[in-house]
From Swiss-Prot:
PANTHER family: ACONITATE HYDRATASE B (PTHR43160), ACONITATE HYDRATASE, MITOCHONDRIAL (PTHR43160:SF3)
Protein name: Aconitate hydratase, mitochondrial
Taxonomic path: Eukaryota, Rhodophyta, Florideophyceae, Rhodymeniophycidae, Gracilariales
Keywords: 4Fe-4S, Iron, Iron-sulfur, Lyase, Metal-binding, Mitochondrion, Transit peptide, Tricarboxylic acid cycle
GO cellular component entries: cytosol; mitochondrion
Function description: Catalyzes the isomerization of citrate to isocitrate via cis-aconitate.
Transit peptide stretch: 1-28
Biological processes per GO annotation: tricarboxylic acid cycle
Amino acid sequence: MIAMDRIARIPIARWTSRAFRVSAAARQTPMSPLEAHNELEPVYAAIDDRLNTVRSKLNRPLTLAEKVLYGHLDDPERVPVRGETFLKLRPERVALQDATAQMALIQFMASARPQVAVPSTIHCDHLIAAEVGAEEDMAKAKSQNKEVYDFLASAGAKYGLGFWKPGSGIIHQIVLENYAFPGLLMIGTDSHTPNAGGLGACAVGVGGADAVDVMVGLPWELKAPKVIGVKLTGKLQEWASPKDVILKVAGILTVKGGTGAIVEYFGEGVDSLSCTGMGTICNMGAEIGATTSMFPYNSRMGDYLKATGRDGIASLADSFSEQLRADENAVYDQLIEINLSELEPHINGPFTPDLAHPLSKFKEEVEKNGWPAELTVGLIGSCTNSSYEDMARSASVVKQALSHGVKSKSIFNITPGSEQVRATISRDGILDTFTEAGGTVLANACGPCIGQWNRSDVPKGTPNSIITSFNRNFSQRNDGNPQTHAFVASPEIVTAMSLAGSLKFNPATDSLQGADGAEFKLAAPSGDELPVMGFDPGEDTFQPPSDDSTSILVQIDPDSQRLSFLEPFPAWDGKDYTDMPVLIKARGKCTTDHISMAGPWLKFRGHLDNISNNMLIGAVNDENGEINNVKNAVTGEYGTVPDTARAYKAEGVKWVVIGDENYGEGSSREHAALEPRHLGGVAVIVKSFARIHETNLKKQGMLPLTFNNPADYDKIDSSDKVSLVGLKNLTPGEPVTMTVTKADGTSMDILLNHTFNDEQLEWFRAGSALNKIKIDLGT
């Protein structure tokens, strides 16, 4: 099924220099139906011009990823080198979700710019907790989060951002329905922004500081990614779905195998996938550390564009399609081949999204590992799998069970991805099918996927299993219970297992017992890719930017516990960092969920000091194997990680964190970098970083450093004192020396690496990227 090579030349389509030109009079295709003044024709013409310049320099065929990235270069005269060059790029769009938007907008306000420089939107999806059902939960969220929603709405109106009110849906589904288009380059303050790759966009998850760069009019910096090609052949069969493609790829590449790379799908099998199915695959590319994932433009994307009222974009993309797919003989740094005809459903987990199990072997794995076989809850939806097709196919499974008098044996929760999807599946009877089987429809929001779940069916600490169509399944992520074994699968498999109430049920081979006692088998799911009667937009939940923002005030109550202006971090004083304690040596997986938990902490995302009370409370202390219990090197007493950091800060003691592999994987949340900076940390020293977190640390004036020899991690003890010397000579490509002093007074030097370029070193010296922006703008 799978073949892998280091370098691969794949025949795709011949390449030639070309010119895409339209007259000024013909420029009439809006990039979004909601933004008639932003036209697409000039975007495609600019991409074409830049690519012709780049081709003259490289003189070789280009991958799709290269075409879109290099087509947005600020200076196409500079020759890009994959894996080496830092690119200066000009994205067309920025998207912010409400949890990360707060700090991003507070930073933008500090820049003193009057309006955002590119089309930008705010999406209210992260602050809505699931508990009872959609209506009750939404009312509660609007009441509890009124201060934050009012701030975001007024900031959007003041600074020119579109505002999607609570209940609109999940950011990535809204982007796909309204803003994404083939060839788009966009950034979003959420790690699953790559979802838009299902519509041929190059969409990258970033921290808020990166978003601020683009919103103030600066180019966005990205190290030129390598490109991993995934060739798809054949056609999905029976119970297999697009979700199984990325579950399989995650098993191959692992959670860090895509780091520093874009995953690009191609091959005849692509045309058998729906646009939203391709979005699912791109969405979960975040779980392998990929910069983003992309599909080439095809008729399935055109169908989706037309179904969502963007016929003009589909027509224009058809005429520009040569630049929306890879060239013939494009070179990939790595190749994976998957025959869709042979791909079986997969279930990944628990506790990590890359532990992949074919469905046929999953029962055996459950028994062998002693995982709780009883399925307590099944959840479908989320930004990964909440399309009309996902819901229709899942409903087809439920209808079969209902015809035999069978309802869900597990608690069954459904999360529509957007108000448009909710209204459409309600009109078409799909929601009624789910509720008839005992399902509970949750709000159009992230909910349990990000830990916004006030779960009451299982006491915390009780071993249990859940299965979801979400993207992540880290320990405690969904419900805060470290004993919840969370598994990830397609919505069809989740639905079937929920009906059976067991992880051991294989819908492809096993039978259910009907109300009459007779056994029956479920047929493979089916469902329309797009609604036959078209989409129902539902309630209007969009607030466009104000035409006149001069009179709009954006205020923050100085006594607020939810929002606070950001005090500038101090600039580097030009001295080495010496005799610093190790706040914590984190053992094993340390995601951004471990560093800055979500769930109940989301309400403090706009208040840095308050949310800093969750810093690293989920990380395992290598010294004692405990969570949130570290030794204060000054007093000798044990305390929580945040309290110990605050004690150091009060005494003027700088500190460092030591970490393992792929430190900071997961969410794009920049709070995981802001918090250690705020509490007095100066460096994070690990075996390896996840891309977004490493950048976020740099943006906040921290030193993200990696062991030159990963085995040196084992030489560090929590009781050590460390010094980072020679910082005045810190230059790109040159290692940093760390002197480690043991408790007995002996010392050793350890070499550390970094990935700073010259401009990023200016962030460090200025104290943060925002400080540097303000210096450059004279504000």
